[in-house]
Amino acid sequence: MRTGIFALAALLVSGVMADDGEWRKVEPHTMKALRELRARQSGGSSFIPGTTQGHGKNCVDAFGAGYELCADSKVCYNPTEGDLCCSEGYPCPNGSFCLTKGYCCPNGLDPKECAKQHNVELPPTYGNGNTKPSGAPYPTGSTPPTGGSHSTGAPKPTGTLPTRTGTLPTGTHTGPTATSPPIYTGAATHNTVQGAAAAIVALGLVQNFL
């Protein structure tokens, strides 16, 4: 009976573990360890951060709120606590910055000196040349633009062209007005005919008297 119960419990546990994934989180570097690394700066101070194992469906489930996955490394980090996710896909704990090939270097040290400890050559694209470089976070969304900004051409001048103001002379011009020709109605011809007829009659009467 007990054997069956233990077997059932083992199956349940294995089923739960099968649903959960195995994750690791970057261990915080203690201030004491960082001070010791800075003290050994002449001999090199780079280090590969340690990790702690955990189980869960994701980083938050395995280690708590604030933890995120660093690239596809299966290693979680907490940016709210100052951890960094390097551009090469590995995390560095708070108080350090990204070097290369999984190495981190304490803040305030020369990255070239840190890389020299393990005969690591910094990539040509490594741009942290100051004494307090900061790690380049791994892109977690849209790919950031590469290269410097470029000119898009000289801006076109803006403004308004001058406009001519004023009024054109209007003036008044009186042209000759045309008059319509008289309309012929035929009345003048009729009067003339009557006058001619009367003259003929009068002439005839005069001839009779003579």
From Swiss-Prot:
Cellular localization per UniProt: Secreted
Keyword Glycoprotein among UniProt keywords: yes
Keywords: Glycoprotein, Secreted, Signal
Major subcellular location class: secreted
Signal sequence annotation: 1-18
Domain of life where this protein originates: Eukaryota
Disordered: annotated span: 125-186
Residues the record marks as carrying a glycan: 94
Protein's name according to its UniProt entry: Uncharacterized secreted protein ARB_05178
Organism: Arthroderma benhamiae (strain ATCC MYA-4681 / CBS 112371)
